[in-house]
Regions:
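Structural motif corresponding to the intra-repeat A-B loop/turn of tetratricopeptide repeats
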Residues: 15, 28, 35, 55, ...
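Alpha-helical adaptor scaffolds
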Residues: 34-39, 46, 56-86, 90-93
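Amphipathic alpha-helical segments of tetratricopeptide repeats
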Residues: 6-17, 46-57, 86-97, 126-134
Length: 152
């Protein structure tokens, strides 16, 4: 997997196709995240996000913000993760990416230290998933709400 990702990265580095290069960096970021090399994952996700922001590809940018946030959570950097989630949420809301909004709100509900704000994020996520008919995600968010209510 690593060799494939590195080959794609090298092959697209010198091309004019910024989107493909950004995607190859995101794939590398995902690889490094899976093997818990958070520094390299952050490096590649950040590079992908920078390129996608220039290309005006808001959906991909939101997805990479979420991936960056997850790597930061895994690294114990919850406050920084929340910043990426909030950036992604702003773009998702501006573009009416409702599924992504729900996902980001659920993630914010996991990292937010303030219990009241955590509940707010989770309730908003739950409402969006209910509107979208995403039953499985609703159950998962309901479990998060339960944990928040129980103070965990």
């Amino acid at each position: 997997a690593r060799e494939h990702a590195l080959t794609a990265y090298e092959d697209t580095k010198e091309t004019e196709d910024g989107f493909l290069h950004a995607r190859s960096r995101a794939v590398l970021g995902r690889f490094y995240a899976k093997i818990s090399d958070n520094d390299l994952a952050l490096l590649h996700y950040s590079g992908a996000l920078e390129t996608l922001s220039k290309l005006d590809d808001p959906q991909s940018a939101v997805e990479v913000e979420m991936l960056l946030g997850q790597v930061l959570v895994d690294a114990g950097r919850r406050e920084e993760a929340a910043e990426h989630y909030l950036s992604g949420l702003a773009v998702a809301e501006a573009n009416d990416f409702r599924v992504l909004q729900g996902e980001i709100l659920a993630r914010l509900g996991e990292v937010e230290p303030d219990r009241s704000q955590r509940m707010n994020y989770l309730q908003r996520s739950l409402s969006l998933f209910r509107e979208l008919g995403a039953v499985d995600r609703m159950r998962e968010v309901q479990n998060s709400v339960h944990r928040a209510v129980m103070g965990k």
